Amino acid sequence: GVHWRNSFSYDYTNMDEMRWYNPEHGNGAAVDGRLSKYAISDITSTFTSTLNYAFSLFNDHHIGLLAGYEAYKNTYSMLHAHATGFSNSEMIELSMASTPYETKSKKDHERMQSFFGRINYDYLNKYFLSFSIRTDGSSRFAPGHRWGTFWSIGGNWRISEENFFKGIEWVDDLKLRASYGTSGNKQSDYLYGFQGLYDTGNNYNGQNGITHLQIPNDELSWEKSKNFNVGIDFGIFGCLNGSIEYYNKTSDALLLEKPLAPSTGFENAISNLGGMRNQGIEIDLHSTNINTKDFTWTTDFNIAFNNNKITSYPQKEEVVGTKIRTVGYSIYEFYMQEWAGVDPVNGDPLWYMDVTDDKGNPTGERTTTNTYSKATKYKLGSALPSATGGLTNTVSWKGVDFSFMFTYGFGGKIYDVYEENLLNDGNKTGYQLITEQADSWTPENTNASNPKFIPNNSNTSNGRSSRYLHNA
């Protein structure tokens, strides 16, 4: 029959936030206390309308049709006030500050419309086909590039329903499935990436001023992906269900920040550039360990392995912060100086540096330097874990549920920016220090883990390097 369904959702979030830095110690000491207050409002509404029609042909053929429309709207507003200089740490109000620093506000709007359709077909509840298509329009992109059309086709074969499989009693269900299609991505940190943006309230020489914040990109459009999946779903022994799936996703026109030449006056601009591939295997298992009238215990386990590589890029390589973008490597590849330890003679920090010939070409050998800016940057591994997953156990007794979840990830690198601040050898003032800083070089402790501690140090020993890069 025909079913027409309409739904509307409205989410409203209101948040007041205060950040207080005490004038007596820590980061607030240098400015006699710092107070920031935020008032944030986030409103999201979604309207969805779908029309379904299902029918059968000759009893064995089943067809389902769906057509739909969706409208999405989000409004985000924020008011921020910031001040320093508090003579009394007990009276934490902006009006008590001697130096009102800044007041800012903003309001962001995002809209999206979608039209979509799907056809499902099955024969004898054993052979299934599905085709879907959707067209999405997003306010994030420039006029003329706002709409993207994406589709997918998939099928599965329920092997356990075949006559030749009926005798295998320990297999409850076995299904082989595969799909291929395209998808789009609009997510980035830029709601208005195609527009030039300006910031008011920037005074210069006592006069009001406006700052040009963002260069426009009127060619900005959807990030597009091609997705292939193949997997097996199974149920065995009446108590264990699971799936094993291989996926391969290739993406083009990635939404990335493109660094710009300093002469432009901008650091970067959101652009469509390069290609990337993600492929891997995902395994999900669900077991019913105990199932009685009053007591049930189930376990869910999953693990995923993902390999990420940049497949194309308009430049040979591009450094973005502590990462590097280059073909053949992960987009999460760390690129920075490699820590070589401490000079036992004088306590200087050391980093590795390539030895070069008289033409400036690397010879393949390395030496060390105590000058951070002279040290060579190296590719030092990806932030992407080799595997991620989770384990959940759920126990139910007479209607009372108890569960605990454990998530994990191993492999990959993590950069500890907090350690950079708290193990700084005197390079940063106003920070507390961690206990590892006690093992600093002295004439009596020449095999120390950390360089000589010098208050108001300027040797950049805490510069971003593999000193703070750890295995996850």
Predicted regions and their residues:
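Surface-exposed, extracytoplasmic segments of Gram-negative outer-membrane nutrient-acquisition systems
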Residues: A29, N205-L213, T250-L273, N308-L384, ...
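Generic secondary-structure boundary signal with a strong preference for alpha-helix termini
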Residues: P23, H80, G193, D358-G360, ...
